[in-house]
Curated annotation (Swiss-Prot):
It comes from Yersinia pseudotuberculosis serotype O:3 (strain YPIII). Bidirectionally degrades single-stranded DNA into large acid-insoluble oligonucleotides, which are then degraded further into small acid-soluble oligonucleotides. GO terms for molecular function: exodeoxyribonuclease VII activity. It catalyses: Exonucleolytic cleavage in either 5'- to 3'- or 3'- to 5'-direction to yield nucleoside 5'-phosphates. It comes from the Bacteria. This is Exodeoxyribonuclease 7 small subunit. One of its GO terms (cellular component) is exodeoxyribonuclease VII complex. Belongs to the XseB family. Heterooligomer composed of large and small subunits. Keywords: Cytoplasm, Exonuclease, Hydrolase, Nuclease. The gene is xseB. One of its GO terms (biological process) is DNA catabolic process.
Length: 84
């Protein structure tokens, strides 16, 4: 089976925008009316959005942990997310 070309990167969108798009994708997939190729493309986009959302949530959680650190004397450092 030929190897598929890498899909283009998702443009950075707000978490809420990505979540809304993901909900729309789920609705279209659950309708069962999409042709197979369209359904696969929608599924692939959904997986990308989920991964982006997970990364956003992880970064937010890390920022909260830094802010709630028990060491009140520790200086706050700017949060720099890992980019992949």
């Amino acid at each position: 089976m030929p190897k598929k070309a890498a899909s283009p990167e998702i443009k950075a969108a707000s978490f809420e925008t990505s979540l809304s798009e993901l909900e729309q994708i789920v609705t279209r997939l659950e309708s069962g009316e999409l042709p197979l190729e369209d359904a696969l493309n929608e599924f692939e986009r959904g997986v990308q959005l989920v991964r982006q959302g997970q990364q956003t949530l992880l970064q937010a959680e890390q920022r909260v942990q830094i802010l709630l650190s028990d060491d009140v004397d520790a200086p706050l450092k700017p949060f720099t997310p890992d980019t992949e």
